Amino acid sequence: MAAKDVKFSRDARERMLRGVNILADAVKVTLGPKGRNVVLDKSFGAPRITKDGVTVAKEIELEDKFENMGAQMVREVASKTNDIAGDGTTTATVLAQAIVQEGAKAVAAGMNPMDLKRGVDLAVAEVVDYLAKAAKKIKTSEEVAQVGTISANGEKEIGQMIAEAMQKVGNEGVITVEEAKTAETELEVVEGMQFDRGYLSPYFITNPEKMVAELEDVYILLHEKKLSNLQAMLPVLEAVVQSGRPLLIIAEDVEGEALATLVVNKLRGGLKIAAVKAPGFGDRRKAMLEDIAVLTGGQVISEDLGIKLENVTLDMLGRAKRVSIAKETTTIVDGAGQKSEIEGRVAQIKSQIEETTSDYDREKLQERLAKLAGGVAVIRVGGATEVEVKEKKDRVDDALNATRAAVEEGIVPGGGTALLRASSEIKAKGENADQEAGVNIVRRAIQAPARQIASNAGAEASIVVGKILDNNAVTFGYNAQTGEYGDMIGMGIVDPMKVVRTALQDAASVAGLLITTEAMIAELPKKDSPAPAMPGGGMGGMDF
């Protein structure tokens, strides 16, 4: 086992604080509408430019092991806030630095670290209550756009696009962000349920110009096994032909004789038909077939349920107003499923999302939920250069997460104003003087985001904070973009309550651990042993 270096109390805290400050100082320059960029060197390719706090934090690794421990603890704050709220990582870092700095001073003055932490926790709980009461629920699309605009560093186009996407696919819908192939940023919305499987034969195409098969007012047969022979299907096929409607077959596969028979019937005009493979694999395929069944009001033909193909009747088939099948995707629009059954299925998937521990499973469940509940929107981010596109994509991701958080828990006045107001509303009393000091640490620390936003905008932080606190209006604050004071909500400068709350709770949690640290242990750097001397060249007795 390698030898360790151990640091205690003041020495340990000082080293750790240096690391906290290095990381936080690099991250906090990005805060606010006038926040600066940070350039990250990459081992290959062009450097990356970003204003995203967590991206900056993840790049920082310090040489000194003890300083690095402090930096990594604060990086954890940014990551945790990003995981829960998806935004607010810079605010969380600024808050953590402020609480640690104030706490370190108090510990150096001889106060009890555990009592300080209890005081900090008391004050944070009260601030969270205050924020919950101050939060305003989002009702209009304009308010959604405002949140998106603020989080995208004041870019209105992005805010509008996110508001439009959420309006079209609903709050449960999936909105994905991709890099565009062009310089324009655009929004594409896919109605209905789309999955990644296309037609099994190009002969099914009905629209040669667009290379798609379009079926109107269509029956849908859902089968979980392969179809290689159509003998068992003849009764249901005859019933479909008599109804005069088209048929879509979704099965594990349709092959050989079965596929050939379907193609021949389609070409002769006797049967309007198309076949696609079922989406997904294994258990996920079964679940997705069930989703399609619920959406279209049909049944999955499965021998597990004792249903055989020869016994299938028309009322077991799903129905939809329109189906569009391209080379690699199938879209089912306006399925005939019962609303109550779809809602029940949505609730079931939501409970699975809450229970799962796997990020991959959660992502797949959320995709299924979106396909059932709303639809899918894709924001394609464009720019003149690859570096610009990546920087803009970071901002769109942040804006999207902030907007979802705002819809979930409401909004509070932005620009650090909500926390600034909370600082004068803290009434918590500690059991002793040290706990009181912990409460005061939070009282001072939660002013840090507003101060940082002001100084990044080139204003004098203490004058800005003083002016805001002198005014009693709850929404009165400082617009760093224009340099004006006024009603923050009226000016459209708002923060999602969930983002502010998560940033404060995560910052206080990690800062509390750092304040109460008394010893730090790290491996001693390995000493390079000198290389052995090289033997002399040449051969004995020879003169070279």
From Swiss-Prot:
The keyword Ribonucleoprotein does not apply. It is an enzyme of class 5 (isomerase). GO terms for molecular function: ATP binding; ATP-dependent protein folding chaperone; isomerase activity; unfolded protein binding. The keyword Isomerase applies. Its main location: cytoplasm. ATP binds at residues 30-33, 51, 87-91, 415, 495. Pfam families: Cpn60_TCP1. One of its GO terms (cellular component) is cytoplasm. It catalyses: ATP + H2O + a folded polypeptide = ADP + phosphate + an unfolded polypeptide. It comes from the Bacteria. Its EC number is 5.6.1.7. Keywords: ATP-binding, Chaperone, Cytoplasm, Isomerase, Nucleotide-binding. It is found in: Cytoplasm. GO terms for biological process: protein refolding. HAMAP family: CH60. Belongs to the chaperonin (HSP60) family. NCBIfam families: GroEL, PRK00013.1, PRK12849.1, PRK12850.1, PRK12851.1. Forms a cylinder of 14 subunits composed of two heptameric rings stacked back-to-back. Interacts with the co-chaperonin GroES. Together with its co-chaperonin GroES, plays an essential role in assisting protein folding. The GroEL-GroES system forms a nano-cage that allows encapsulation of the non-native substrate proteins and provides a physical environment optimized to promote and accelerate protein folding. This is Chaperonin GroEL 1.
